[in-house]
């Protein structure tokens, strides 16, 4: 597997995490079958692809990227879908997450 392939798998894992967590609210405590099934399948795909990405990428880089991009994406879903407007401290924190993800990936020797 190449480094590019590992990052593609990581991107799929991130998409799975975003779909899974994004549908979690719609599951209504896993009482609604369709959103629950989507949530479970998405997280299974996420974990499977992330485990393969970790064959090449260091665990710290993989997890930092996965969680950082997921946090940003889900925060944007919260803003646009649920009208959850972040305050200044939250916005600063989100900007720092983006900076951190960029730094760990550009300074990575993998």
Feature-to-residue mapping (PLM):
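Polytopic alpha-helical membrane proteins, predominantly small-molecule transporters/carriers
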Residues: 1-110
